[in-house]
Swiss-Prot record:
It is a lipid-anchor. Residues 8-74 form the Ubiquitin-like domain. May serve as docking site to facilitate the association of other proteins to the plasma membrane. GO terms for cellular component: plasma membrane. Induction: Not induced by pathogens, cycloheximide and ozone treatment. It is found in: Cell membrane. Keywords: Cell membrane, Lipoprotein, Membrane, Palmitate. Ubiquitous, but three fold higher expression in stamens. Pfam families: Rad60-SLD_2. The lineage of its organism: Eukaryota, Viridiplantae, Streptophyta, Embryophyta, Tracheophyta. Acylated protein. Probably modified with palmitate. A lipid is attached at residues 115, 117, 119, 124 (S-palmitoyl cysteine). This is Membrane-anchored ubiquitin-fold protein 2.
Length: 124
């Protein structure tokens, strides 16, 4: 019974409404490890899946979870009932590499502020 208390059953809700899990994780499991699980278990038939842990953001109880936090740190004081499954929402944000940044921004394209003055009347 003590083992169940020190674990949290988590399912990961994807953007299309499908789920990965649920699966039991010990309280000492880090958010980074949860993200590794999402990357490893991402359905192969789904497009735009995460390539690395850096592409994944996990949201629980309205908060974006930090990689160094543990499952125990992320427990909500309200709503974690014995045997209840915790749903974490998965957001995929692919990291833009320096090469891609340069490709998107044409060389010599500097932002220029332009002011235009229009006069509609006898005095200007």
């Amino acid at each position: 019974m003590a083992e169940v208390k020190d674990q949290l059953e988590i399912k990961f809700r994807l953007n299309d409404g499908s789920d990965i899990g649920p699966k039991l994780f010990p309280d000492a499991t880090t958010v980074a490890t949860l993200k590794e699980t999402v990357v490893a278990q991402w359905p192969r038939d789904k497009e735009n899946g995460p390539k690395t842990v850096k592409d994944v953001k996990l949201i629980s109880a309205g908060r974006i979870l930090e990689n160094n936090k543990t499952v125990g740190d992320c427990r909500s004081p309200v709503g974690n009932f014995s045997g209840a499954v915790t749903t974490m929402h998965v957001i995929i944000q692919h990291q833009v590499t320096e090469k891609e940044k340069k490709k998107k921004k044409p060389k010599g394209d500097l932002k220029q502020n332009k002011c235009v003055c229009l006069c509609f009347g006898a005095r200007c």
